[in-house]
Amino acid sequence: MDSAGFEGSREDSPMPKLTRRDAGLILVAAGLLAPYSVAADGKPLAIKGYDPVAYFNMGTPTRGLPEFELEWDEHRYHFVSAEHRELFKADPVRYAPQFGDYCAMALAMGERDEANPENWLISDGKLYIFGKPAPMGPALFQQDLAANVAKANQNRPLIQAR
């Protein structure tokens, strides 16, 4: 037995050694993934942590930061700055994706598909996010925007109930 009360030595162990460097990398990786999951209170992170205001103000999908978090409509939103958080807080309906984390085109077709925050469209001042590969989702959705929005709104409660 060794001084810790275990038989055998580290050299005999079939498990590879975990170095301090490896442990540090594991902790860093865990920290990077943690903000993009469900919180301890059970509220999911909206649009995978992307800042909804950034689509409008920066013209690009941009990941928000946990330190600029706001809860709205049973979801947690992350923002790139306190300014973006305050803009959203003042008018969340303006900035939130129209169909939350669902692909807008899939809902219009009566299907359920998770949205990809990198595949998006702003039309008539509203943010739509798609799961289908660009440009299929946005291009197809925009061909008959009014009808697709109406179908998606009609199908959403049915899809959510599944």
Please report, for each region that a protein language model flagged, where it lies by residue.
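Short, Lys/Arg-enriched N-terminal segments with co-localized hydrophobic residues
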Residues: D2-P14
